[in-house]
Amino acid sequence: MLVIPAVDMKNKKCVQLIQGNPDKKHVELDNPPEIAKKWVSEGAEMLHLVDLDGALDGKRVNDEFIEDIIKTSGVPVQIGGGIRSIEDAVYLIEKGAEKVIIGTVAVENPEIIRELSKKIGSEKIMVSLDAKDGKVVIKGWKEKTKYTPVEIGKILEEMGAGSILFTNVDSEGLLNGINIEPTKELVDNLKIPIVASGGVTTIDDLLKFKKIGVYGVVVGSAIYKNLINLKDAIEAVK
């Protein structure tokens, strides 16, 4: 199982938000490319980049840093945040991203995944599903749909999604541990790999995810606040 450090960018800084709220930050650091290199030097085999300006405002202001990290990190990079069109996705893959992460637009219009898979291949497409109280939420967690993650996951798998990034919003950024069940339901019901995110605070949390068969886990606040040592975490889940 992969342990995948998050490098979330806002206003050209590396940040970690509490519950996705741009006004509440655990962490704010300069020079995201240097942070990315630090995680790779500690053993990260993949990086998870999020352009929060893109996600929140639909404006891409961190492209320079994103391209820098793709070029210099030496590991595959998955990127999300503000990818709202096929053109955005193709642009990032051409720049060298390993995977693009598509969120709201895929839930609202799953057909876009079919079109995109024809252009870049399923293996390059990760769809981000975020759930709150058992239902998928979209638009930066502001709007709740009537669908469960498994219902939407099956549709997206059929359309050509290569993997799912699943965030349990109830746990995200609070540093109070995980609820494994919603992720397990996805792993049990879909064939494509599931990457989990949200609420990991201990190596024990990571081992719980490993036990249910996830492909990887994105870690954010816990490594920035030194609750988890990345090197130890990677070693523990090998």
Curated annotation (Swiss-Prot):
Record-level GO cellular component terms: cytoplasm
Annotated transmembrane regions: none
Pfam families tied to this protein: His_biosynth
Keyword tRNA processing tagged: no
UniProt keyword terms in alphabetical order: Amino-acid biosynthesis, Cytoplasm, Histidine biosynthesis, Isomerase
Primary location: cytoplasm
Family: Belongs to the HisA/HisF family.
The protein's name in its UniProt record: 1-(5-phosphoribosyl)-5-[(5-phosphoribosylamino)methylideneamino] imidazole-4-carboxamide isomerase
Native organism: Methanococcus maripaludis (strain C7 / ATCC BAA-1331)
